[in-house]
Amino acid sequence: MAGDRPRLVTDTGFTYDLDGAEGFEQTVGRVLRQTFLLDCVTRTEGYYQVDLHERRRVESRLDVDFAALYDRPLADRLETYLGVSFETVADAIPDWPLTVDVDPTVESLDAIPFVANDLAVVRTTPDPDPRPVKQTPEVITDFLGAETDEPVTTEFVTPDPVSFDTIGHAWVGDSPPIDANKLTVESLRRSLDVDPDESPIRIHVVCNDTAMRDEQVVSEYYQLNDRHQFDISMHTELSVAEFRELLAESADFLHYIGHVDDDGIVCPDGHLDTTTLADVNVKAFLLNACNSHEQGMGLVEAGSLGGIITLFDIADSIATRAGLHFARLLAAGHTLRTSVHVLRNHVLAGARWMTVGNGGLSLCHSRSGNPLYLRLLDTDDETAHTEIQTFVTPSHGLGSVLNFHIDSDTRYLVSGELDTFDLSPSELDDVLDGDTIPVDYENDRYWSDEISAADLL
């Protein structure tokens, strides 16, 4: 509908101004998040009623008859939702799974249907010009093993911070971003052609650096998810021709351990430059090597759907530790993007990993449907004060609910921090036994299949 100001208009005549005090993009983002929350609350009515935690939080604040609203047309529901002050319900809105910054060009427009389908909050970038970013000296010193006064400088786009709690941050545009998933339209399109099947998940683990062979144990970590069958092959010191041939074969995932330099992926007999490849049939990948962004983009442009790469030089010890955690996170059902999110707090500051292509891909399903993440905030002999977070996946997106059987039948909307719980030792063990979960306590990272409440309390 033509007009001087952006607005939302329903077929019943209701009009809502989208050019609010916070500006158009901020207002649209608020409308999306507020409408989502309140419609989820309304949908707890009907034939299959749900005891929803978020309804308990907001119902007493609102003068809304949700039982009556359930039977009303969507336009009437929307008018009711937007009659509520955003601040009244803001603290009950789930952490948003994805915010996408879009370079406002014609080429970027084709990405909009995909990010809208993910219910992402979309922003345009007024100044997307890449700027120099310096790698922290500590990382370079660790990598080189000597002091240096010359930090490495690379040009990246630095998206503006998001003003609300968001888990994933993505960028659509030409230049590489800092701390965001570089989406590409072609990788999103190719993802539509992927049909799930019952065949084993095929993974190639390639180690082209004998000094990093400790990371080869990842082959065991990928198989910890007993809901799936895995076909894992190990490869060491692949030649350029052998590596090129491997990438041409159909596979679900490549975990590369080794080195990348300006000429490409380092092989015993030279370099494999992925930007020269015409056909890659590995769906997703982890290039756990120094400054692997360009080679990762080469894989995506040649056919991969998405992957995890590094932006700077990474010390071998840090890369090995990160590779082991990535394998566990992906096997636990995390997407490429949420794997990076969960890992970021547990590597040296400045050593940055990011995703390229479709960062919303997952390798397999979590036992819980949505992968979990636990933070033990405080403990004593009888109680663990625990924060539980969860994340959306391609199969269990926004609107999914979880029940922990901790407090009867209460369910929680998935995405981000759900709540804090005071758990007894037996309740904590029940949570730890239910799935493979990363657990953070006193600045250390544990895994639920390696510990019990007795180790923590």
Language-model segments: residues:
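N-terminal secretory/membrane-targeting helices
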Residues: M1, D197, L224-R227, A241, ...
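Long terminal accessory regions outside catalytic cores
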Residues: M1-D118
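Short acidic, S/G/P-rich loop/turn micro-motifs used as interaction or catalytic elements
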Residues: T15, D209-D214, E237-E242, H259-D263, ...
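A domain-level signal for caspase-like cysteine endopeptidase catalytic cores
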Residues: P97-F253
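Proline- and acidic/polar-enriched loop/turn elements at helix boundaries
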Residues: V185-S187, E237, G258, L311-F312, ...
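Catalytic cores of nucleophile-dependent amide-cleaving enzymes
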Residues: Y256-T338
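Caspase-like cysteine protease fold
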Residues: H271, H334-L457
